[in-house]
From Swiss-Prot:
Subunit structure: Homotrimer.
Main localization (coarse): virion
Residue intervals annotated with topology Virion surface: 21-461
Protein name from the UniProt record: Glycoprotein
Extent of the signal sequence: 1-20
Subcellular location: Virion membrane
Organism of origin: Infectious hematopoietic necrosis virus (strain WRAC)
InterPro entries, per the entry: Rhabdo_glycop_CD, Rhabdo_glycop_FD, Spike_prot
Keywords on record: Glycoprotein, Host-virus interaction, Membrane, Signal, Transmembrane, Transmembrane helix, Viral attachment to host cell, Viral envelope protein, Virion, Virus entry into host cell
Carbohydrate-modified residues: 56, 400-401, 438
Family listed: Belongs to the novirhabdovirus glycoprotein family.
Segments crossing the lipid bilayer: 462-482
Amino acid sequence: MDTMITTPLILILITCGANSQTVKPDTASESDQPTWSNPLFTYPEGCTLDKLSKVNASQLRCPRIFDDENRGLIAYPTSIRSLSVGNDLGDIHTQGNHIHKVLYRTICSTGFFGGQTIEKALVKMKLSTKEAGAYDTTTAAALYFPAPRCQWYTDNVQNDLIFYYTTQKSVLRDPYTRDFLDSDFIGGKCTKSPCQTHWSNVVWMGDAGIPACDSSQEIKAHLFVDKISNRVVKATSYGHHPWGLHQACMIEFCGQQWIRTDLGDLISVVYNSGSEILSFPKCEDKTVGMRGNLDDFAYLDDLVKASESREECLEAHAEIISTNSVTPYLLSKFRSPHPGINDVYAMHKGSIYHGMCMTVAVDEVSKDRTTYRAHRATSFTKWERPFGDEWEGFHGLHGNNTTIIPDLEKYVAQYKMSMMEPMSIKSVPHPSILALYNETDVSGISIRKLDSFDLQSLHWSFWPTISALGGIPFVLLLAVAACCCWSGRPPTPSVPQSIPMYHLANRS
């Protein structure tokens, strides 16, 4: 191996070992870690539609996969208190609303001969966080375009209505910093509601969320110690990813001392029947944040494995982006194999939906595949379908009469081909664009910025175009041509009764 490569690796291992704590618990025990770490299947529970939002294909993320091989390690019973969401997802979601400011504009163009073109446009208005809370809002169902205001021989007569309305949107809340977290926010986070979003006319407002410094209830867990060095390697508990302790250190937060794990979780650990408290050297910095904000490479020691599964997911992601389509099989690659709070994905009518939800380990699937039994459960449960129908579920699960689970179907010799059927992916529209009712008298509906209203984008009919080109000169030219043609005709013999002139005028 090249010395340029080995030297950094040795330094990493030395650094990781420097903070490790040596302990000698009194009682060893069997851990149930292998039971849930690689279960038959995992599936979300309680993941309702209000916890999901549309994302583009580029926003899909492959799950972390942790190596739970415990060779050379001894498990000891312990209790863990976490200043994180622990096994309960309730506190991590904060309910709120997108507040939109949109101008509904009806445009009428009337030609010289009375022909009309009516266009309707949504015009984005700038909305500040101060303005967002100052006006009464309505719901999306109450929106409407104003009646056209038309004037003879005039183009682009506008009739405008401004609406402030809300659409439901839940976001995540960092239990440490109390920041609101969502890809809609500038920089992905916001410290205080209301929050500015990437869209100039949309602001997010939500409730206060979880109180600061709340810790979860004590969790029964296991502490894993190296047999030879007696150094603490990790801690585990059902429904949570392993807490890596290779680079753990002590940090003060909310007036208490906490262990900051490799991925940034804050926990406290007691062992030997509660008589001993696990501690580490003091952290060199005071960074706190939701897990995953710290250096992920800490898990390269022994907690991240299954590079094949990770590579399969990355290849699936590349295929989805390049083809702009997804199959249930490809979507199944984004399922986390570990229970706990994970990213979940579903497809519905060409859109990809994403959420952060609690997933459970599935120990058994019924013979007809319609139900499953979760780990430690005594009864079977139906698969949750977030869209209320009997076809689409999470991570490629689909089917009506027969439930097809791509992760399990791939092992069947005669697998169902429906899991290979591609679905075209729709891009996520601007959040202010809604299903626009039964607008039958309109040549086009578009959304525009206030400062870029473009007359060339109008959809013209023939007669208003005449007026735009200059109706009167055009009509005069026609009249002159008609007179010339008329005067050039040979004279006709007189008749006893002539056609009244107003008849001739009506025909021209």
